[in-house]
């Protein structure tokens, strides 16, 4: 809002927050693919989806968990939980995205 008030318009998604699955390379962020051998990996590449969202003015607020190598909900940090029932996993390679969306 402050930027818009100053006349700074970043694009059609200006200021819209989003989270990106931890399969996509983003400068300055680890891209772990949820797998222990890659937990410290910083890739020199930048994912096209990130570039396009950034160019449209969207704001990255989180890298979201994915199961190891995009398989299931278990990653090197544990198991991604269902925010409505912590005894359950969120399931699937989009477990982090699903949990974040369900949690609001």
Residue ranges of model-derived segments:
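Gly/Ser-rich catalytic/binding loops embedded in alpha/beta enzyme cores
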Residues: 1-104
